[in-house]
Amino acid sequence: MANFPASLLILNGKSADNQPLREAITLLRDEGIQIHVRVTWEKGDAQRYVDEARRLGVETVIAGGGDGTINEVSTALIQIRDGVAPALGLLPLGTANDFATSAGIPEALDKALKLAIAGNAMEIDMARVNDKTCFINMATGGFGTRITTETPEKLKAALGGVSYLIHGLMRMDTLTPDRCEIRGENFHWQGDALVIGIGNGRQAGGGQQLCPTALVNDGLLQLRIFTGEELLPALFSTLTQSDDNPNIIDGASAWFDIHAPHEITFNLDGEPLSGQEFHIEVLPGALRCRLPPDCPLLR
């Protein structure tokens, strides 16, 4: 792999002491691969490191962390207007790794790192909310969002993605739907939503396939609503994902407008955003990402 250009790895600070990762990087450096490593400490670090990556002339910026880290790095990359932006590489090191998992990124660090450096760079979409905040994977609203934001860090560290489900069952007493109206291209729905998923990717919340047919290069966002007229059956529908479930509403559009009479919160790749009005639009071909040739998210 000695002929491959340099890369810069932006590593979430929680993974800075990952010994297998250190060994994998050392092995690649011994093969002649140039890998710069930068560790994030606070919000805004990813943007600064992407700026540095451009000065260094690297061809790939690797996001080492979970969905939040991937979001920060990809958001910084799409801000580049002059010249060709580096490609995005994915190194899943977070609690859930929903986007990387649905994209078919290898779990083995050495294989994921090689793919991030040498894989084919494919143009993929991103999404933007209210002309400001972006997400690469999914926007989730409703009870599921409250669970992912409230699940204790120690529980997530110990149990991974299943921690969200366990914490959700513990919080059944707070289970209430969100009343809202959602419009899109040839789509209109109004009612009580237990869970809302608007996906560029397919899964969120530690492996829940909220938008199982989403693709990252089709110029569309997939919508799935779990209606909340009957709360307990709707919750179990969320977990079982049956194909003929009357509590599930699906849609697809390049944009969605959401209005709620009260404040609701969406989780954008781990970042909460609250309000009563949301305009969510796809950004077609917003960045290049190194993905496996059999990536399920590509059409």
UniProtKB/Swiss-Prot annotation:
GO BP of this protein: phospholipid biosynthetic process
Superkingdom of this protein's organism: Bacteria
A GO molecular-function descriptor: lipid kinase activity
Compartments it resides in: Cytoplasm
Binding site residues for ATP: 40, 66-72, 95
Binding site for Mg(2+): 215, 218, 220
DAGKc domain span: 2-133
PROSITE patterns referenced in this protein's UniProt entry, alphabetically: DAGK (PS50146)
Cofactor note: Binds 1 Mg(2+) ion per subunit. Ca(2+) may be able to substitute.
Gene3D superfamilies recorded: 2.60.200.40, Probable inorganic polyphosphate/atp-NAD kinase, domain 1
Keyword line: ATP-binding, Cytoplasm, Kinase, Lipid biosynthesis, Lipid metabolism, Magnesium, Metal-binding, Nucleotide-binding, Phospholipid biosynthesis, Phospholipid metabolism, Transferase
Family as reported in the entry's similarity comment: Belongs to the diacylglycerol/lipid kinase family. YegS lipid kinase subfamily.
Record function comment: Probably phosphorylates lipids; the in vivo substrate is unknown.
Name this polypeptide is given: Probable lipid kinase YegS
Gene that encodes the chain: yegS
